[in-house]
A protein has these predicted regions:
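Core catalytic alpha/beta fold that binds nucleotide/phospho-ligands
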Residues: 1-152
Length: 152
């Protein structure tokens, strides 16, 4: 059963966390179906309602995954923070004003840019230097050393 780590008041957008995804029973399709079941169960549907239009996006890192479901276009990213050559990577992918060797700043920027790019439905490599012009929601209730953002 996935854990809800974000939901709007009207349940039009929800983010589900899956842990221990390296176990055999945690495959991508099963996780997505479980998130859809939970999301659809909370939607206000009557006998006369049209089929629910679900936009979704998922991300995984280390042994964790999130699936975001929404009635609107959505992008999500999570990253497990670990030591890397941050300055070298940020020089390659980020705008020159965003170059950093700080792990938390690097992963915050990376997750924001990846969530935004997924929301735009574009290639990540082509969009890491762009300025984000949408509100981003930091995901809370994530495991230690995991950072994540949602773009709606």
């Amino acid at each position: 059963m996935p854990q809800v780590i974000f939901e709007t008041e009207d349940w039009s957008t929800m983010v589900f966390l899956f842990t221990n995804i390296n176990e055999p029973n945690h495959n991508g399709k099963a996780m997505t179906r479980a998130a859809f079941r939970e999301y659809i169960a909370r939607q206000n549907v009557t006998d006369c309602s049209k089929p629910i239009n679900v936009h979704w996006n998922k991300s995984d890192t280390h042994t964790f995954a999130v699936v975001a479901c929404s009635s609107e276009k959505i992008g999500v990213d999570i990253e497990y923070m670990k030591k890397r050559p941050f300055e070298k990577i940020s020089r390659r992918y980020f705008h020159e004003h965003e170059v950093t060797d700080d792990m938390e700043i690097f992963f915050d920027l990376w997750c924001q840019k990846e969530a935004y790019t997924k929301w735009k439905k574009e290639r990540i490599a082509e969009n890491m230097r762009v300025k984000i012009d949408r509100p981003l929601i930091p995901l809370e209730n994530l495991p230690d050393n995991v950072v994540g953002y949602l773009c709606t």
